[in-house]
Amino acid sequence: MVIKAQSPAGFAEEYIIESIWNNRFPPGSILPAERELSELIGVTRTTLREVLQRLARDGWLTIQHGKPTKINNFWETSGLNILETLARLDHDSVPQLIDNLLAVRTNIAAIFIRTALRHNPEKVRDVLTQANAVDDSAEAFAQLDYNVFRGLAFASGNPIYGLILNGLKGLYIRVGRYYFSNPEARKLAVNFYGRLEALRSEELYDQVMDVVRHYGKESGAIWHSMQSAIPRDIAEVRR
């Protein structure tokens, strides 16, 4: 187990999460007592207690007053906020994880973008205008692409779509930095934003789903061509 955290709390959190992932603390089992666990990890009980509360909020654990702390099946109890953690824990699963992320984005975007264009065209125009002044760099495009999809999600009038994008943000932008290092990916994105603006101005709302799905296929093809060289630190938080 290689843990890179720099603070005692960060170390304790990574230790427990990796122990759950590696089945040292399997789902359904009971976490060791606070005193035993704090000595095992090498942190104070106060620090450990704070970490356990945070992990419980993220769905890794269930803290029961007067009862031992239970390990959850995190696939059933956690939210989108653990995606980065999962990618960091198992680099070999990253391509499949990102494939799933892109499929979800395409499927929901086809719905919320059409709704946004139909019901909030002025806001859509404002969102798409961001693409007119973007720097031609991977970093800039990663942030732009996230902002465009998130902006269109909220422009749909259904904030749940926006909250989903919020949950994807960390991994989305980290993957985007790698994906948009390919000039063809940046060119494809600019063309896609331009096509959406054309559909908005011409009120061709019924074509939105086909355009979004076509973009999903084309961007997916570029992504698949880049998968073999995915950086091992793609899910690492920049310090």
Swiss-Prot record:
One of its GO terms (molecular function) is DNA-binding transcription factor activity. Residues 34-53 bind DNA. Gene3D superfamilies: GntR ligand-binding domain-like (1.20.120.530), Winged helix-like DNA-binding domain superfamily/Winged helix DNA-binding domain (1.10.10.10). One of its GO terms (biological process) is regulation of fatty acid metabolic process. It is found in: Cytoplasm. Its main location: cytoplasm. Residues 6-74 form the HTH gntR-type domain. One of its GO terms (cellular component) is cytoplasm. The keyword rRNA-binding does not apply. Homodimer. Multifunctional regulator of fatty acid metabolism. This is Fatty acid metabolism regulator protein. It comes from Pectobacterium carotovorum subsp. carotovorum (strain PC1).
